[in-house]
């Protein structure tokens, strides 16, 4: 299990845990992690959680997905402990 903290502007942070699996993050009703904020696409990014760690991949969002301040390109990137993912 991996601990996560989700911060949406003008809202209190939400904490949770992710087990192995694939999670879609976005504003759409079918997203596993649903966020209601400006600049978030219905299917914004994907988190893949495995025993070896977490990977993040942008799903063609309009405003991008960032890992420690760098906009993601094509493909998945490994997320290390303490890294920050920003969407929108």
Model regions and ranges:
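Forkhead-associated
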Residues: 2-8, 12-88
